[in-house]
């Protein structure tokens, strides 16, 4: 099989920096908003999910597709979810 999965998770992009590989979580609202940059794709995927939750609570009505991380137990997911940071732009976002 010649299939290589480049982006396993919605809203996660790989960044090759001088300091190494990092993962950016980005969500599209009225343009792209960077949620944050993380050490792992799983952290970035969970940050994307957290941003979705925040935006829905703020009244944004979009059909965002959340990420499902099969490799984590619910408690491990919850631990990362509670610790992962989300950019101030998402926290302060006001729907139009």
Regions found by a protein language model. Give the residues of each.
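Boundary-flanking segments of nucleic-acid-binding domains in nuclear regulatory proteins
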Residues: 1-96
